[in-house]
Amino acid sequence: MCCYFIAQIKINDADEYQKYLDGCDEVFTRYKGEYLSVDGNPTVLEGEWDYTRTVLIRFPTELDFSLWYESPEYQQILKHRLKAAKCDSLLIKGLDE
């Protein structure tokens, strides 16, 4: 069953965040991730929205997600995002295919 990683990001240090982006794609594609949306200006329908970017990523399985997120390569670049931005994220299960 596929799963979706959703991240709401508020960037506070663009230069440090760029270091994260510079290394992210190479690691990401190695673990079967697929960007479905990266949006800096979503349409807010309800509530307040104080984020710079919203990201939606699909993984074929939760195992693929875990292998990516917990990989030494990703953990090495993750430190840049943690320094540069506030991020609220979650993992949700897809519907049976």
Question: What role is predicted for each listed range?
Answer:
Residues L82-E97:
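C-terminal end-helix/capping segment
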Residues M1-T54, R58-E70, Y74, K93-E97:
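Short S/T/G/P-rich N-terminal loop/turn motif that feeds into the first structured element of a domain
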Residues W68-K86:
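Electropositive, surface-exposed helix/loop patches at the edges of structured domains
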